[in-house]
């Protein structure tokens, strides 16, 4: 029995230092055509694929560093958004993608994001917002996207007791840039 206690103590120490394998449940959310499925395929297979809109939720197992994630890619069209709530129980993080090149839909994205922030079930769940498609000529700057989404005061690397961790990262899934930093940031809260 004492050996198991010692093992548990050692595991707890390693876990507190972030050195033990962790497992998390992530939801990939955002409006349709933001790049959720493309990102998931890039993380899983390290390549782009020609994809159709996501009509049905899909699940994948991913490993990023020492953390294993069960990811759920939920469609972003209006009908699919009604199903998002079914996946909230036991979620450890939300990855919310926004098409940074589609400024006409920023308000719609902000409404959905604000609605998610108001859900009591998610009050302590960390959110990483990815401003995707920064390689597109019409993409806005990080400052413009933060203003459009009402994310001028995010938590960054600070851990503030009682405050949900939220951070915005700009990325281009097709250019393979920006999103790994976002997952590294998110992993510290899982």
Swiss-Prot record:
Reaction equation(s) it catalyzes: GTP + H2O = GDP + phosphate + H(+)
EC top class named in words: hydrolase
Superkingdom: Eukaryota
One example GO MF annotation: GTPase activity
EC number(s) on file: 3.6.5.-
Oligomeric form and interacting partners: COPII is composed of at least 5 proteins: the SEC23/24 complex, the SEC13/31 complex and SAR1.
Family: Belongs to the small GTPase superfamily. SAR1 family.
Protein role: Small GTPase component of the coat protein complex II (COPII) which promotes the formation of transport vesicles from the endoplasmic reticulum (ER). The coat has two main functions, the physical deformation of the endoplasmic reticulum membrane into vesicles and the selection of cargo molecules. SAR1 controls the coat assembly in a stepwise manner. Activated SAR1-GTP binds to membranes first and recruits the SEC23/24 complex. These SEC23/24-SAR1 prebudding intermediates are then collected by the SEC13/31 complex as subunits polymerize to form coated transport vesicles.
Identification of the protein by name: Small COPII coat GTPase SAR1
Organism: Eremothecium gossypii (strain ATCC 10895 / CBS 109.51 / FGSC 9923 / NRRL Y-1056)
